[in-house]
Amino acid sequence: MATSVLANWHGHDYQARYFWIEASRLKNPQQDFVVEVSYEADGPKAFDDVITRYNPPRRSTGPDRIQADYYQIKFHVTQAASFGFEDLIDPAFIGAETFSILERLKQAKGTEPANSAFHLVTTDRIIDEDPLGEIISNVDGSIRLDKLFDGTTDRSRKGKVRKLWRQHLKLSTDQELEQVLSGFHIQQSQPTLEAMREKVNTCFQIIGLITCETSSDFRFDGAARALRSQERYRFTREQFTALCEEENWIRSEAPESFRNVALRSFSDGPLDIMDALPEHTLSLLSLFEGRFPSPGIEWNDVIKPQVETFLTGIRQTERKVRLYLNTHSSIAMLAGKCLGHKSGVEIELVQKGRMGDSIWSENESQDEPDAVIETETVGTGSDVAVVLSITRNALPKARAYILENQPDIGRIIHVTPANGHGQRSVKNGSHAVAIAEQVSDVVMDADLPVEASLHIFSAAPNAVNFYLGQHTDFLGTCVFYEFDFQRQRDGSYLPSFKV
């Protein structure tokens, strides 16, 4: 099969999977404000791949409520593609010949309701050092109008962006350009095609529909193609339920009723809003720049109280929680401490990974061997470090940091899965629980002095971090650490919470 044909198929399948994820909200009782989802229906050109409508309008990260989300979905087979601010005036960037994405945005803003949001969703990434990357919000992908319209002249770095876009759109003033760009979101580096398959499966599992886990052909891709051939593009809540019944997708047993709760210090893009209702979501995105807190924001003084207050409220009102943890490992551990064994809350975790999302619970069956645990003496201090090498070997970097910065640490307890570290080394929720319990037992046996601290360096799925956090009430004073993957600081570890 020609590569171009295969790429075209993959592009349609990617778009279809995005549609199914959005459509699953029509059967989610916690998202009853979602009233219609359409797929390549009549809508503003270039923003009609998927359209989601709300009544009442959904909340946004700003003061306005959103009546509809319009999506342009752009997929590439490889991750080699990248783009910058100049590409937004090139019709070829969206596979068109005449109109650019910005021209289509301007047209759409003139025909659609004022409180609409328009999204460019792409697997491509923004070119390093391109000015576009400096004006995209890490919170919701919107254009940071305060950053773009910064009072500089057209000869400045941001001014060149404004001038190019303004002239391309035949606008006279920056004020007119600002009106066009308001409500425009760019979501780069979106999940892979395979990860989107797992997201569909997870969304369908939550609402009580069958999934497609093992077949090489993903049945819902074919179902989307069939809908297009039948010219069935729009679905209300009633119509989507009827489709599920027609296709025999509804499971015989009703799904358990868990309250969706989301903690977020990283973003997956526009799909984030599906995780949980705003009142059950704590977004910490505005407190971070990359992997580390923004200037003036401290882990213990600012971030920790927000997490604790939010989860205390959840613990007081909910008994069954499905927890979405798109967070730093330290926040996942703190969440486990807040929702510990004595909280009385039954927890189901949505584990995020490179291959998509999956639901993990501590009640799953597992027969994995115990983790391999080795203890190394590195000094005479009374503190102990636990290094979790679950997804990668964290020991060399952790040991180097400890020897240079933490003379009070005398022993390192190193934990690796019996089958070796890697992205798939933890099989499910019960396996994660078993690892956390084993680590807790070893630390208890280490007999730390009362005045000593336990230092935790984790390269592990957040499920392991969460379950280990549930044990920290019994482990004395604990210090969590974050690794500088992006070399924002020194490419090593830095302490985060002390609990």
Curated annotation (Swiss-Prot):
Residues 258-464 are annotated as: C-terminal SAVED domain. Its EC number is 3.1.-.-. One of its GO terms (molecular function) is DNA binding. InterPro entries: SAVED. Probably binds 2 Mg(2+), only 1 is seen in the crystal structure. Residues 1-226 are annotated as: N-terminal endonuclease domain. DNase activity is activated upon ligand binding (cAAG). Inhibited by EDTA. Its cofactor is Mg(2+). Induction: Part of a CBASS operon consisting of cap4-cdnD-cap2-cap3. Mg(2+) binds at residues 49, 73. The active site is at 49, 72, 74. One of its GO terms (biological process) is defense response to virus. NCBIfam families: SAVED. Effector DNase of a CBASS antivirus system. CBASS (cyclic oligonucleotide-based antiphage signaling system) provides immunity against bacteriophages. The CD-NTase protein (CdnD) synthesizes cyclic nucleotides in response to infection; these serve as specific second messenger signals. The signals activate a diverse range of effectors, leading to bacterial cell death and thus abortive phage infection. A type II-C(AAG) CBASS system. Binds second messenger 3',3',3'-cyclic AMP-AMP-GMP (cAAG). In the presence of cAAG (synthesized by the cognate CD-NTase protein in the CBASS operon), endonucleolytically degrades dsDNA to approximately 17 bp length fragments, with a preference for 5'-C|NG sites. Only binds DNA in the presence of cAAG. Not activated by c-di-AMP, c-di-GMP, 3',3'-cyclic GMP-AMP (cGAMP) or the second messenger of A.baumanii strain ATCC 27244. Belongs to the Cap4 nuclease family. A monomer in the absence of ligand, in its presence it forms oligomers. The cyclic nucleotide ligand binds in the C-terminal SAVED domain. DNA binding requires the extreme N-terminus. This is CD-NTase-associated protein 4. The gene is cap4.
